[in-house]
Design a protein with these regions (language model features):
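Short secondary-structure boundary segments
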Residues: 13, 83-85, 106-107, 151
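Short beta-strand->loop
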Residues: 1-2, 55-61, 78, 91-140, ...
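An extracytoplasmic/periplasmic, membrane-proximal ligand-sensing/linker region
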Residues: 97-99, 103, 116, 125, ...
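Short helices/loops that flank or line small-molecule/ion binding pockets
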Residues: 46-47, 51, 66-80, 85, ...
Length: 216
């Protein structure tokens, strides 16, 4: 995996919400722009709405995050769940002016840029809620954009390619070009990817059923 996503939740300054605690206590739902079920913008928003009881009104049907950004800046929606990597590269102006506030992270651990922004998993009140959040975080984070090989590929070949990939992704020229484009190279090894996928495949039937119900 060349880059792992860290999904975060950004809300508009105009909502008056500056923290997850304020959001949880809000009486009015924040309209969140989303693409559709199956996309990270929708799935991550829906799972925290259900698992944490966050007041969110999902407005889906946008054709991408660029139209959602336009809707955000026009006041049509008041928030978005997207990867921090995307926020940092395409929402720089809104972040610098404080027009968007990052108040919650969906990932398993805080992104180094956001050490004080709480994790959704830590706000969950039940074991089921934590499992729901963890599953969606893995599916749209650590296991996103995988490089895969066909079944039956000899293990020695897999090992060679895994090692070569991780060495290539550390190439100084590549990292320099990525830095110029404000893109984050945040690789996950083949072993980590395999572990994450196996964990998703081992989800309890009750959790799978609940996710199907939530993310339909």
């Amino acid at each position: 995996v060349p880059a792992q996503d860290n999904f975060v939740f950004g809300v508009a300054k105009t909502t008056g919400i500056t923290s997850a605690e304020q959001w949880l206590a809000a009486k009015t739902a924040v309209k969140f722009g989303a693409i559709a079920a199956g996309d990270g913008t929708y799935d991550t928003s829906k799972v925290v709405e259900v698992a944490l009881g966050l007041p969110i009104q999902i407005v889906s049907g946008y054709k991408g995050t660029a139209p959602i950004r336009l809707a955000f800046n026009s006041g049509e929606v008041g928030g978005l769940s997207n990867s921090w990597q995307s926020f940092r590269s395409t929402w720089r102006k809104e972040l610098e002016t404080g027009e968007v506030m990052i108040v919650l992270q969906l990932s398993a651990k805080p992104h180094p840029d956001l050490p004080k922004v709480p994790l959704a998993m830590n706000l969950a009140k039940t074991d089921e809620s934590r499992k729901l959040i963890q599953a969606v975080a893995q599916a749209h984070g650590a296991a996103v954009r995988p490089y895969v090989l066909p079944p039956g590929t000899p293990k020695d070949r897999v090992d060679i390619l895994r090692k070569a990939f991780m060495e290539a992704i550390k190439d100084p020229e590549l990292l320099n070009e990525a830095g110029k484009a404000n893109l984050e190279i945040n690789p996950g090894s083949g072993e980590e990817l395999e572990r994450n996928v196996r964990e998703l495949l081992r989800l309890e039937p009750s959790v799978v059923a609940r996710l199907k119900e939530i993310l339909k």
